[in-house]
């Protein structure tokens, strides 16, 4: 995946070229049970210096860095993550899943991370009690957002990305400033 940002004069231009691949294994259903595991790796095949902040904004490249690991801009070679590791139980047309897995729901989706999606850890179910009714929900306690390699609790996963500013011009600064009774 290649991308480049050509900014206006006075701002830094960036480019990045990423390559990667993944392995995934999912068993056939056995008495309703199914196991899955997957991992993904990314390599920086060539880029501008993604550790260099723009002199005018004092910010790193937002988009090009997102191809790799936003938490570790220096890492160009060891960008890998165990993405899925789950046990799933199928019953009727429904299922119950536990572990690390990809989730597409009205609230959380795979998102376009270009090189890797967001992944969740917890327990999740989709129930189909009737032809026109679908119920889904669960308890998610860890997240590995797109463009990262590590796992974070719910409150620690919010604010990892560069954020906007408040109406008065101050940084929003969600990261490490949220509390929750959950995760």
Predicted regions mapped to residue ranges:
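Transmembrane beta-barrel strands of outer-membrane/channel proteins
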Residues: 1, 37-41, 98-100, 137-141
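Surface-exposed strand-loop-strand hairpins of Gram-negative outer-membrane beta-barrel proteins
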Residues: 2-18, 54
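Surface-exposed extracellular loop regions of Gram-negative outer-membrane beta-barrel proteins
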Residues: 88-103
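Membrane-embedded beta-strand positions in outer-membrane beta-barrel channels/transporters
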Residues: 20-22, 83-86, 122-124, 183
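Extracellular loop and loop/strand-boundary signature of outer-membrane beta-barrel proteins
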Residues: 7-11, 70-73, 108-111, 176-178
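Signature for the C-terminal beta-barrel architecture of outer-membrane proteins
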Residues: 16, 114-183
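Structural signature of outer-membrane beta-barrel channels/translocons
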Residues: 26-28, 88-92, 126-130, 183
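Repeated loop/turn-to-beta-strand initiation elements of outer-membrane beta-barrel proteins
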Residues: 32-35, 93-97, 132-135
